């Protein structure tokens, strides 16, 4: 393959830094031509100097302008939160291949993003959706029976709802598998993140919500599965390492040799799968309802959750109040008739204000 010119959005975050590792290890495949960050100007400057990058930007607005102006083959969106929607649309509208780690932009943007994307232009970087994309190569679209997303279960797997009432912010940040930021790690503990991933899977692959399931897999080795109509199940398995889906996102449809360590089949392995406890973790069922409703509901779901997570880490509310607040805000929402960027921003603003009012902030 020829050298691909890459723009990395959110280069100072976890995904962005691992993407730079992939690029550094494969100079014959990738060249960084643009870097952006939210606020870490010093770190961004260091990265630009290291990789010889002239085009940099701070903030989502400048990131969007950079995406439209820089001549690139692939844009990796590693921004956290719905502020990534503008850069996502900019990449798609500019004809770049979009390696998407910023799930919120797809979930919030919904049909706006789908309409902007040409076939094969949007490549998922989330480990679960990268796994699904790989497994879906094994059959035709009409042969797919179900998508099965795996979840580690987070740090509170096996606990009852009542026992979660006293969870502290520090406990919520102790993820058993992945090293992520504050919001994503908290979302993984509440399983809001898995709920968002269900919506993302529907939008990416067009499979109805009643054929998308979640199973708990504590070892986090099987990243997702596709069940076909003949009863076959195709799974993608690898040791947990985000560099693998990142490299696939940058190189798709080609694989990048030597990106991750293979499983060691000379030793015994135990992989377990168990049903999700919907009573203790209602976020997945709520997210499915939100996804079915569509429109501005996913934007409201995501924004209300961000406000509730911030309140939890500020010590203003309890752990169970996070998802309870999101549900109350979603129930109070009156959707807009037409989906536009302006309408989405308005719905998000309403959701944040509504969440704050309900939380007494």
From Swiss-Prot:
GO molecular function, one term: manganese ion binding
Reactions this protein catalyses: 2-C-methyl-D-erythritol 4-phosphate + NADP(+) = 1-deoxy-D-xylulose 5-phosphate + NADPH + H(+)
Residues that, per the record, bind NADPH: 12-15, 38, 102, 104, 181
UniProt pathway annotation: Isoprenoid biosynthesis; isopentenyl diphosphate biosynthesis via DXP pathway; isopentenyl diphosphate from 1-deoxy-D-xylulose 5-phosphate: step 1/6
GO biological process: isopentenyl diphosphate biosynthetic process, methylerythritol 4-phosphate pathway involved in terpenoid biosynthetic process
Record InterPro entries: DXP_reductoisomerase (IPR003821), DXP_reductoisomerase_C (IPR013644), DXP_reductoisomerase_N (IPR013512), DXPR_C (IPR026877), DXPR_C_sf (IPR036169), NAD(P)-bd_dom_sf (IPR036291)
EC code(s) of this entry: 1.1.1.267
Required co-factors: Mg(2+); Mn(2+)
Record keywords, A-Z: Isoprene biosynthesis, Manganese, Metal-binding, NADP, Oxidoreductase
Protein purpose: Catalyzes the NADPH-dependent rearrangement and reduction of 1-deoxy-D-xylulose-5-phosphate (DXP) to 2-C-methyl-D-erythritol 4-phosphate (MEP).
Family the UniProt entry places it in: Belongs to the DXR family.
This protein's name: 1-deoxy-D-xylulose 5-phosphate reductoisomerase
Source organism of the structure: Leifsonia xyli subsp. xyli (strain CTCB07)
Organism classification: Bacteria, Bacillati, Actinomycetota, Actinomycetes, Micrococcales
Gene name for this UniProt entry: dxr
């Amino acid at each position: 393959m020829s050298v691909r010119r890459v723009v990395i959005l959110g280069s100072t975050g976890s995904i962005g830094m691992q993407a730079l590792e992939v690029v550094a290890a494969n100079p014959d495949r990738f060249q960084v031509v643009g870097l952006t960050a939210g606020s870490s100007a010093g770190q961004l400057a260091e990265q630009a100097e290291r990789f010889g990058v002239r085009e940099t930007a701070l903030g989502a607005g400048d990131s969007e302008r950079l995406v439209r102006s820089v001549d690139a083959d692939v844009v990796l969106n590693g921004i956290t939160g719905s502020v990534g929607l503008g850069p996502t649309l900019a990449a798609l509208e500019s004809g770049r291949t979009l390696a998407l780690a910023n799930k919120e932009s797809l979930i919030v943007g919904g049909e706006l993003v789908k309409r902007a994307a040409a076939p094969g232009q949007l490549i998922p970087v989330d480990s679960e959706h990268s796994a699904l994309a790989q497994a879906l190569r094994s059959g035709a679209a009409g042969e797919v029976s179900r998508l099965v997303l795996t979840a580690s279960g987070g740090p509170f797997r096996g606990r009852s709802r009542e026992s979660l009432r006293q969870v502290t912010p520090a406990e919520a940040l102790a993820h058993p598998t992945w090293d992520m930021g504050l919001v994503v790690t908290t979302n993984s503990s509440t399983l809001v993140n898995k709920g968002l991933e269900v919506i993302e899977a529907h939008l990416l692959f067009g499979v109805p919500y009643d054929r998308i399931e979640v199973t708990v897999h504590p070892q986090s080795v099987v990243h997702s599965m596709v069940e076909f109509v003949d009863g076959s199940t195709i799974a993608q398995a690898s040791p947990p390492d985000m560099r693998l889906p990142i490299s696939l996102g940058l190189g798709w449809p080609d694989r990048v040799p030597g990106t991750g360590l293979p499983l060691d089949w000379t030793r015994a392995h135990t992989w377990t799968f168990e049903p999700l406890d919907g009573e203790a973790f209602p976020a997945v069922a709520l997210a499915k309802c939100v996804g079915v409703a569509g429109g501005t509901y996913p934007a409201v779901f995501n924004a209300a959750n961000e406000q509730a997570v911030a309140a939890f880490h500020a010590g203003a509310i309890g752990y169970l109040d996070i998802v309870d607040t999101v549900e109350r805000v979603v129930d109070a929402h009156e959707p807009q008739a037409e989906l536009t960027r302006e309408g989405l921003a308005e719905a998000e603003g309403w959701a944040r204000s509504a969440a704050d009012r309900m939380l007494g902030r």
